[in-house]
Amino acid sequence: MLKLLLGDPNARKLKRYQPLVSDINLLEEDIAPLSDEDLRRRTSEFRQQLENAGSLERQRPVLDQLLPEAFAIVREAGKRVLGMRHFDVQLLGGMVLHDGQIAEMKTGEGKTLVATLPSYLNALTGRGVHVVTVNDYLARRDAEWMGQVHRFLGLSVGLIQQDMSPAERRQNYGCDVTYATNSELGFDYLRDNMATDISEVVQREFQYCVIDEVDSILVDEARTPLIISGQVERPQEKYNQAAALALQLDRAAEMSKDGIDPEGDYEVDEKQRSVILTDEGYAKAESILGVEDLFNAADPWAHYVTNALKAKELFIKDVNYITRDNEVVIVDEFTGRVMPGRRWSDGLHQAVEAKESMPIQPETQTLASITYQNFFLLYPRLAGMTGTAKTEEVEFEKTYKLEVTVVPTNRTRARRDLVDQVYKTETGKWRAVAQETAEVHRTGRPVLVGTTSVEKSEVLSALLQEEGIPHNLLNAKPENVEREAEIVAQAGRTGAVTIATNMAGRGTDIILGGNTDYMARLKVREALLPRLVRPEEGHRPPVPLQREASSGFAAAASAPAKPPSEARALGRLYPCELSPDTDAALADVARELVKLWGDRTLTVLELEDRISSAAEKAPSEDAGIMQLRQVLAQIRADYDAVISTEQASVRETGGLHVIGTERHESRRVDNQLRGRAGRQGDPGSTRFFLSLEDNLLRIFGGDRVAGLMNAFRVEEDMPIESGMLTRSLEGAQKKVETYYYDMRKQVFEYDEVMNNQRRAVYVERRRVLEGRDLKKQVLGYGERTMDDIVEAYVNPELPPEEWDLSHLTNKVKEFVYLLQDLEPQQLAGLSMEELKAFLHEQLRIAYDLKEAEIEQLKPGLMREAERFFILQQIDSLWREHLQSMDALRESVGLRGYGQKDPLIEYKNEGYDMFLEMMTQVRRNVIYSMFMFQPQPAPAQEDEAVV
């Protein structure tokens, strides 16, 4: 009703931008005839105008005035360099981003191109713009591909990759537009704030940031803090003993009610992802381990036992992690990709290693940490784009103060979303999925099936194998990950069947009829691998692993193997043989490249990098890449001839059919899977198959669903369609989203306390690092320390003759040994304020004496010592403080039982602990400075040794 009266707020926002779009379209005629040099000259003129404006606040209105002309220039540059012209809806998206909002743009609408508009405009200030993507490959691709537009217009483009040195990072952060991943940005920020010299700092002050796949970074990853840690030694045998103990303890069938423990040793709360021992469980664990108390501070066991039980019950192999090369590797629950190098904290990873009988790696101690939420709030202006943001609109507004604007699609959507089919059991559901896949496959339409875990994708694969349907499997298992590009390249071909685990973050579009660009790359890779890559690197032929009888399933051993010719036909990757001319050209290029790049000297990654550069339009100095580019175009032309007819037939039969096999905890991830079909106005359809045994319904659907299960006396393979059930599903998803939102909000609120402390420490640290007024700072520390001593030993309510001046002078001498001749009589008769002023004066005199003594040895050594001691104290005490804050956070939750708000308790106590830490820093620095006795350098050296 409100919408009818007031109109759609989203439409109102878009209407506001419409006049600007018209202005840009009018400017197009004036800008098209300009020469390349003229366009670059405009960039310099814009920069001059902004420089004249001065501060960032004053530059903002100037940027808004320049917007129409700047966008028109970027559109023209895009046409000239990339052969791509920004559509009107892309201009709208650019304006939304420039205004510091989130632009929701559907899959395939060219989000990457949209980012060039606001990043060019905001880079004109010279303060740097960061464009953030989810992985290194996408950052590199965008920097090479979209970076051409910026370079063409005279801006510098930087790229941050995982293996770069600090010097390379500093150079790239110094560019006008820098492409990077969210984790690299965050870790560089933390490393900068651990630097011991200003020359080690790589980032400059933040200004403007555009995040691609913003929901993935600001919502999905918001619960995971970025942590830099150092190793600490802990007894490894405890993990193994705890893992063995976990196997001897029995899980309770239900949760405790009204404080009464259930039968069993421990209860598992899947919703909270926690494990709690019952009283019986505590007694049993203590007796098996032969200890009196699991919580004994001298020999603690509780932490190890709880982690071992979590590893047993909540961390499932092939769902949460996979094992390879004798290591436990985490699987990202949102993207289905493995995350090598990432480890769970608090001893959890070690518990999983013990459970899997793998070598246990040392535990770590946090040296610095920040959440993505607080990290991205450091940017004065933040913007983001994604295909699905509307469902999380409230969170974006409350946590990040970011509005969401839905940008219309360029062409009308032709996708059909079919009604969900719900089955009573999981077995019935999987049979139905296999049946639907088979039926659609026989019509010649491509099918994409999304599963939620590696294990489930293997189950479906086995069922399709029984039906004799050729298919490709894409999950976190190493043998499949390597084939990701090939599998996605042909997922849109006639009759292709692809099973993918969490298709959410995968950056490749599924193109109807097949992706000829990818197929051409793979053909080139196949021809060049044996000639250019080192033999020890090893390589596999790029014919995808069709899941045939020989694919390693135990049940498959007795199944009759397909004749080789048929199996090969099913797995054929390329749409046709190359023409003799193209074949000869490819062989020639391969020979030339051996001469240019050496015989089998590259790694697989280096070769793939070069093929990627050749496949994109970025200008290159390398003759080899230019030759590769020509042959790629030739191969693509051969394939296009065949694929264009295949594309037409796939369109006619109805396009890609997407099947979801379980509702994800977030509606957004379901929408991302649906968005794979019907991109850019293509036809397509989607359907979800669910069962009452699915995790989502089991954990969050609650008793209503259990009641429904008993009420439906239906066969396994009969779909249930009921309004109440659909509402239950929607309700369950909303419940989960709210639950996780509350968790993220809680993480945010608790980290907010840490964030204020972190900022204060980092500001202090940076001031020291830059060497500003170091002497003044140390004297300030000393004066505060003197004040603390006076306040500790002088009670203003007592008469002055009762003040404990002898203890006071002794305490002053402990800190400042140069005041050894200070006597209590000198202080007699002074008021409290006079006492403080007198000690400040004495401290200054003593400090000047100390400085003269040190400077005689080596000029400038005093300033170096000041910097060294302040940084050393801040760093070591901040590390201890982080540990204490973690411990406080763990324990503060219990205060809820005492009718106290845990967050307020955490804020108050955390603040007191922080003040105590800063006091400790001041005292330690003063003590260290006066005790500092540098050794005179040997005669042949002219440097003093600290």
From Swiss-Prot:
UniProt entry keywords in alphabetical sequence: ATP-binding, Cell inner membrane, Cell membrane, Cytoplasm, Membrane, Nucleotide-binding, Protein transport, Thylakoid, Translocase, Translocation, Transport
A Gene Ontology cellular-component term: cytosol
GO MF annotation list: ATP binding; protein-exporting ATPase activity
Coiled-coil annotated spans: none
EC number, as in UniProt: 7.4.2.8
Binding site for ATP: Q90, G108, E109, G110, K111, T112, D509
Subcellular localization, as worded in the UniProt entry: Cell inner membrane; Cellular thylakoid membrane; Cytoplasm
Lipid bilayer topology: Peripheral membrane protein
Biological process (GO), any one: protein transport by the Sec complex
Pfam families noted in UniProt: P-loop_SecA, SecA_DEAD, SecA_PP_bind, SecA_SW
InterPro entries cross-referenced by the UniProt entry: Helicase_ATP-bd, P-loop_NTPase, SecA, SecA_CS, SecA_DEAD, SecA_motor_DEAD, SecA_preprotein_X-link_dom, SecA_SF2_C
Reactions it catalyzes: ATP + H2O + cellular proteinSide 1 = ADP + phosphate + cellular proteinSide 2
Membership in a protein family: Belongs to the SecA family.
Role noted for this protein: Part of the Sec protein translocase complex. Interacts with the SecYEG preprotein conducting channel. Has a central role in coupling the hydrolysis of ATP to the transfer of proteins into and across the cell membrane, serving as an ATP-driven molecular motor driving the stepwise translocation of polypeptide chains across the membrane.
HAMAP family in the record: SecA (MF_01382)
Quaternary structure note: Monomer and homodimer. Part of the essential Sec protein translocation apparatus which comprises SecA, SecYEG and auxiliary proteins SecDF. Other proteins may also be involved.
Protein name (record): Protein translocase subunit SecA
Top-level taxonomy: Bacteria, Bacillati, Cyanobacteriota, Cyanophyceae, Synechococcales
